[in-house]
């Protein structure tokens, strides 16, 4: 206990989440000399999405050559689009190479995070009743935070058959000869449906909004290809080319004058829909099904998936695409809105996720910062904002790896590495100054937010106006699109560490008989208005 009677935390850093973000956090913390950290996860092993999602044919719809850390290149992927088991094996290897497993705890669900300003630490309340204390907290819970396992469908609670979500697949259930319904037509269904169709008696697929299913040029990576990727810089060059394509598209979106952008958006949407209709015509035989598959919005409004087998699956006699909507679920059937009732033995709820750009992902009462600041209340009443997508005023010593306006690059790894470079720089600066508390200044947070709005005007127009009605997760319930970072990849990379250190305030723990000297959030907001 120090002279101001503050207590020492159990850990310098606790990382919440042991997926791609948590592994990256552990590696980068060691690089700045921090070994006193703990990584916790609510499930039974590391890997995040790739641990939880073990449904049939689960795999990546991004080329494997780009789906990896820059500090752990893997040249020997089995195929261009890796399957779940090899991705999970890769993550385990990276974690083991950096001695992370001994710093991990599983089956540990944090239900509430409370900041103690007097002791300058976080108290993390576990569902078991345990309390873990940490100087710093890094939230690495991923982009797809909570599976929507109980969608608002009439009668769902009364269903008496077998049901499951792609994030919690029941491997003990034998689908052979069964009547199965899948609700939802996103990326999971794109992979699940072709596998189930060959087993089941009948497969009903319920579609609310048409999705986009792109060609998937998958193939086995031959030994000579793997040798090429293993050459010095081989994987980096291939990844750089892919990043260049993404970067070019971002630059066009950000720098095109608004009138030209709006004209171009209409043209691109029309051409895209026409090209996609041609692709569907090649793959799907039935004219009525083709009509049901064609979106009436631009094909880039939603995150299309690379799923070469899904469209041909709709040609099977035992597969039916149902677009009438769901009227009611009974104990043993689904009645569609047109009155047709179809009996089922099993139900797959591929109904999506709460994502990081949804205010609903941040539950009130779960993250309580300085002076009672409630992150959930803030994000559910204000626009989502965070300085460099990682730091929120009123929440000292806590960082978000996947926050508002964070998504950039070809894959998840790119932007979590950049987020962690920023976080590590802030923690390192705090320790260098001999401080124990760091908090972003409200003025800096608002300045960054306004830059996101200004730089992202073209993207916002497209997503929030032209994509209305697409049910895209790029657009949240507030009608905003705080998903993509409207910067070039180079700017994102450079700015991660090249920022004004005075955008943060630094101090020690408050003395027990002194008032806390911290930024005034409301005053700063008023000054900026």
Where are these regions (language model features)?
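A conserved short coil-to-beta-strand element within the FAD-binding core of flavoproteins
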Residues: 106-121, 319-337
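Short beta-strand to alpha-helix junction loop
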Residues: 74-93, 264-270, 297-309
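Beta1-alpha1 glycine-rich phosphate/pyrophosphate-binding loop at the start
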Residues: 11-104, 207-208, 282-286
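Glycine/threonine-rich phosphate-binding loop and adjacent beta-strand/alpha-helix elements that clamp
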Residues: 346, 350-430
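Rossmann-like dinucleotide-binding core of oxidoreductases
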Residues: 3-10, 14-20, 24-45, 139-278, ...
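Feature captures the FAD/FMN-dependent oxidoreductase FAD-binding
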Residues: 79-145
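C-terminal, flexible cofactor-proximal segment of oxidoreductases
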Residues: 212-215, 235, 239-244, 385-386, ...
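Core beta-strand elements of the Rossmann-like FAD/NAD(P) dinucleotide-binding domain
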Residues: 9-11, 127-136, 175-176, 337-346
């Amino acid at each position: 206990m120090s002279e101001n009677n503050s207590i020492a935390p159990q850990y310098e850093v606790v990382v919440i989440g042991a997926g791609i973000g948590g592994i990256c956090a552990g590696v980068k913390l060691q690089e700045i000399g921090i070994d006193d950290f703990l990584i916790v996860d609510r499930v039974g092993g590391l890997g995040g999405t790739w641990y939880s999602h073990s449904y049939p044919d689960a795999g990546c719809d991004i080329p494997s050559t780009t789906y990896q850390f820059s500090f752990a290149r893997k040249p020997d992927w089995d195929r261009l689009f890796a399957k779940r088991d090899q991705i999970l094996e890769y993550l385990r290897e990276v974690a083991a190479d950096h001695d992370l497993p001994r710093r991990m705890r599983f089956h540990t669900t944090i239900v509430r995070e409370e900041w103690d300003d007097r002791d300058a630490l976080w108290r993390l309340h576990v569902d078991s009743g345990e309390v873990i204390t940490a100087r710093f907290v890094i939230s690495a819970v991923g982009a797809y935070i909570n599976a929507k396992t109980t969608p608002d469908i009439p009668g769902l609670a009364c269903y008496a058959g077998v049901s499951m979500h792609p994030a919690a697949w029941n491997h003990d259930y034998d689908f052979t000869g069964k009547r199965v319904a899948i609700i939802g037509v996103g990326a999971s269904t794109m992979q699940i449906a072709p596998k189930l169709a060959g087993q089941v008696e009948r497969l009903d697929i319920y579609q609310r909004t048409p999705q986009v299913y792109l060609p998937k040029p998958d193939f086995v990576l031959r030994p000579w290809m793997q040798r090429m990727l293993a050459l010095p810089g081989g994987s980096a060059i291939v990844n750089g080319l892919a990043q260049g394509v993404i970067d070019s598209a971002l630059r066009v979106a950000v720098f095109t004058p608004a009138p030209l952008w709006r004209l171009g958006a209409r043209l691109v949407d029309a051409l895209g829909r026409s090209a996609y209709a041609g692709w569907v015509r090649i793959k799907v035989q039935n004219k009525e099904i083709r009509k049901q598959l064609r979106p009436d919005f631009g094909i880039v409004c939603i995150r299309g998936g690379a799923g070469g087998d899904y469209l041909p699956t709709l040609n099977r006699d035992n597969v039916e695409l149902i677009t009438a909507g769901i009227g009611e679920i009974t104990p043993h059937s689904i009645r569609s809105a047109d009155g047709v009732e179809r009996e089922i033995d099993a139900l797959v709820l591929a109904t999506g996720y709460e994502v990081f750009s949804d205010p609903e992902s941040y539950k009130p009462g779960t993250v309580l910062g300085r002076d009672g600041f409630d992150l959930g209340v803030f994000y559910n009443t204000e626009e989502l904002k965070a300085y460099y997508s990682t730091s929120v005023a009123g929440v000292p010593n806590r960082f978000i790896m996947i926050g508002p306006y964070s998504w950039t690059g070809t894959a998840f790894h790119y932007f979590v590495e950049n987020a962690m470079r920023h976080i590590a720089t802030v923690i390192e600066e705090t320790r260098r100054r001999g401080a124990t508390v760091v908090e972003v200044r409200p003025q800096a947070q608002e300045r960054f937010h306004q830059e996101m709005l200004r730089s992202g005007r073209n993207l916002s127009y497209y997503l929030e106006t032209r994509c209305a009605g697409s049910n895209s997760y790029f657009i949240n319930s507030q009608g905003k699109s705080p998903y993509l970072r409207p910067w070039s990849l180079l700017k994102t990379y450079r700015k991660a560490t090249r920022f004004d250190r005075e955008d943060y305030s630094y101090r020690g723990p408050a003395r027990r008989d002194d008032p806390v000297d911290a930024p005034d959030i409301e005053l700063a907001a008023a000054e900026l208005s």
